[in-house]
Amino acid sequence: MNLPIRVMIAGIGGASLGTEIRKSLTLAGGYEIYGCDVSKTAYGLYEDDFAETWCVSRDDYVTNVLNVCIESGTGFLIPGGEQPMTLLGAASDTFAAAGIQLLANTPEVIARYSDKDETFRRLAARGIPIPQTAVINTQSDLDQIGLPCIVKPATGSGGSVGVFFAVSPDEAMIYADFIRRTGSVPIAQQYVSDREGEFTIGVLSLPTGQIIGSIALRRVLDAKLSVAYRGRGGLISSGYSQGYIDEFPDLCQQAEQIALAVNSRGPINIQGRVRDGVLLPFEINPRFSASTYLRAMAGFNEVDLLIKYLLHREMPQRPEIQSGWYLRSLTEQFVAKEIVK
């Protein structure tokens, strides 16, 4: 009888990447899943599907996560969000020294492609089609972008946090000033219509750079959960992806070319809209996506595929995709005050 594979997920808040990763591992079977979070009210801390969970302090975060990994005997650690990815990715050697494999892209890819200004400059330099993108310092910077446009922070805008739709130069500068006052660098990006569809595409690469496969979801944008803003001829999607999963070979091939261009060595998620059949990425995240469980339901369980490769060093076969609609909602649970961690 094979022993279960022990995995730690760092970052398990409600409706988060971490809880979606947990569901993907549960679906695959054969895992003993542990979790940790910095918030004592994180949804996942009280989910029964975790073998054990910990509330860890933000202070000396990496050491605290390392300690609970050692305590639980986990061999794999998966960041469950953008901040854990950045912090833990930079310390991947620390975990490797303790015999713990971090399921993430390389520290170099994470550092380069977590900043949108650098991301889109690098993509343009590699000949990848992109929406016009520029840092906003003065109103004249908008000339190369055009209107309407999207204004957002260069870092930390996952789930469409701090993303604005601007129809005039004055409005764009107000949003840019707001972003700057929060300590971030504002960028403007050409607005691309969703007429030909908005897609989220996951590309999974091995540590060698070889691509296992990719999977695309065409987002449904008529549901309230999926829309952060709609009005004045523009639409901004939310962080809750749902929609239709199919092969979409042309778009997946374009996404795989992006993964190769950025030298991806693990999971990467590409969000974009299509114009004249060309995928125009507006967001690239070098990590698993919060739609990873939808992908697992469709047959492409990227978390399980990567772990199995790291264990056995055998190239997995590309799974067959079950085409169809993949929809989601929010769930609730009661936690008695006596058991809050």
Model regions: which residues?
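Short, charged, surface-exposed secondary-structure boundary motifs
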Residues: G44-L45, V62-V65, A111-D115, G159-G162, ...
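Short glycine-rich, flexible loops that bind phosphorylated cofactors or substrates
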Residues: M85-T86, G158-G159, S289, Y293
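ATP-binding N-terminal substructure of ATP-dependent carboxylate-amine bond-forming enzymes
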Residues: M1-L103
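Short histidine/acidic/glycine/proline-rich micro-motifs that form metal-
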Residues: E82-Q83, P107-A111
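ATP-dependent carboxylate/phosphate-activation module, predominantly the ATP-grasp catalytic core
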Residues: D170, F178, Q190-N263, N285-L311
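Active-site nucleotide/adenylate-binding loops and adjacent lid/helix of ATP-dependent enzymes
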Residues: I110-R195, S205-Q210
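ATP-dependent carboxylate activation and anion-phosphoryl transfer catalytic cores
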Residues: I5, A10, S72, Y244-K341
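Short catalytic-loop micro-motif centered on adjacent basic/acidic residues
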Residues: M8-I9, F76-P79, P131-Q132, I187-Q190, ...
